[in-house]
From Swiss-Prot:
Stated name of the protein: Gustatory receptor-like 36a
Sorted UniProt keywords: Cell membrane, Glycoprotein, Membrane, Transmembrane, Transmembrane helix
Gene Ontology molecular functions: ligand-gated channel activity
Cellular component GO terms held in the UniProt record: membrane; plasma membrane
Topological domain spans for side Cytoplasmic: 1-17, 94-149, 211-249, 315-378
Gene: Grl36a
Cysteine pairings via disulfide bonds: none
Length: 410
């Protein structure tokens, strides 16, 4: 048995090292790609300072802004379908007797939501106050990550399955961007994807932080009395957890308005899935390859990317709940050992009890969760499942309505 434990330690260390590299590469790739695209579309005033390794507010060159604005205006004017896209937002008002009224109505609602969400995203990214808040939150995350590394060493990726799901989601997001025939929904998907990518990178770091604290409590708190260094690190980690909880509350202020846009995607989802169902079951003159090609290039990206994004956030939320419950359990076990601690350091016991009380209050008053639409709506897997079934049922209802009224989309 001792031989087995001796073999397990290097295996665990090598796995931890590999997961540490994977976390660093994945988070760095997500953040750098998002940053390059953000700087490329010339919005906002955020910039990374490589010397101090933090984000700063740096106004863009006036000529860069003017040239970028001119190119954006020319691109919109050059887009032949741009006027047609704007007209589709008000078309049902003037054609209420048309056979395609239902299709036009669904299309108009989707267009109106897309225009509204794009305007909101663009205004936020150009707002100086929003930029400052975003920069402060990013720097808080960088600072917390550095503090935890200094105490626990390199952090490890908590869940490879979440990273795989993110990669699959990213591929369908790219396909969704390509599927859009108009420029405005492409811009909306791009800007929304930028913010969601940064939030996913934060979720990966957040999970790695809590997992590292759990591992420290699991492997560094033996049955015998903890040494002075372990007790000092335990108190530091509890203080850092309090900071993590406070930073997460600040991040939610920026995230909730964006999360509401994820829910508003249900209109586009219903439209895309109703077309997918129609093409699969009712276009019998088309071959399987023709159906698949049409669905793939027009509706598949928009039908799967928002669902996978919601599922990803829900899985992250459920993992956070599980890890915080485990952390609470481990702190309870440490609390039960206070009879041993009292023989060592009465000051440690008083500080630990105070920090544990703070932890219990934060866990109940402001738990680390992923909310959507409001602070009272938690975005876990049950919500993601409800979102999926709501999409499917409404899509089937749309198809039934079209069949009952003999509405043809050809």
């Amino acid at each position: 048995m001792p031989e087995k434990k001796g073999h397990e330690i290097p295996l665990r260390n090598s796995r931890k090292k590999w997961l540490s590299h994977l976390l660093r590469w994945s988070v760095s790739s997500i953040c750098w790609i998002s940053y390059i695209i953000y700087r490329g579309v010339v919005v906002g005033q955020m910039k990374f300072d490589p010397r101090n390794r933090k984000m700063i507010i740096h106004p863009r060159n006036i000529w860069t802004k003017r040239i970028s604005l001119l190119l954006k205006i020319l691109a919109m004017l050059w887009d032949y379908y741009f006027i047609q896209y704007l007209c589709s937002a008000i078309l049902p008002i003037f054609s209420n007797k048309s056979e395609r009224f239902f299709n036009n109505l669904i299309e108009a609602i989707a267009v109106q939501l897309s225009l509204w969400n794009t305007a909101r995203l663009y205004s936020w990214l150009n707002s100086l106050s929003w930029n400052r808040s975003f920069v402060d939150r990013v720097n808080d995350v960088i600072r917390l990550n550095g503090h935890l590394k200094s105490i626990l060493g390199p952090l490890s990726l908590d869940s490879i399955s979440l990273l795989i799901l993110y990669v699959v989601h990213l591929q369908f997001t790219v396909l969704q961007t390509i599927n859009h025939p108009y420029m405005i929904p492409m811009v909306n998907t791009l800007l929304l994807g930028l913010i969601c990518n940064v939030y996913v990178a934060y979720q990966m770091l957040l999970l790695s932080w809590i997992a590292a604290i759990n591992n420290f409590l699991k492997y560094s708190q033996p049955e015998q009395q903890p040494n002075r260094k372990q007790r000092k690190n335990l108190l530091r980690l509890l203080r850092i957890y309090a900071k993590i909880s406070n930073v997460h509350q600040d991040i939610k202020v920026l995230w909730l308005p964006v999360a509401s846009m994820l829910f508003s995607n249900i209109v586009e989802l219903v439209r895309n899935w109703s077309y997918i169902i129609e093409w699969i079951f009712f276009h019998r003159r088309k071959t399987v390859m023709q159906k698949w090609s049409f669905i793939f290039w027009k509706y598949l990206g928009g039908g799967l990317a928002p669902l996978l994004r919601m599922l990803l956030i829900g899985l992250c939320n459920d993992r956070l709940v599980q890890m915080q419950d485990f952390l609470n359990l481990q702190l309870l076990i440490i609390d039960l050992r206070h009879t041993k601690f009292k023989q060592l350091d009465g000051n440690f016991v008083s500080q630990f009890k105070s920090l544990q009380t703070c932890f219990d209050l934060q866990l109940r008053a402001q738990p680390i969760r992923n909310q959507i639409m409001s602070l009272n709506q938690e975005c876990g897997c049950p919500f993601a499942l409800d979102f999926f079934f709501c999409t499917v049922l409404n899509s089937i209802s749309c198809v039934q309505y079209k069949m009952a009224n003999e509405i043809n989309n050809d």
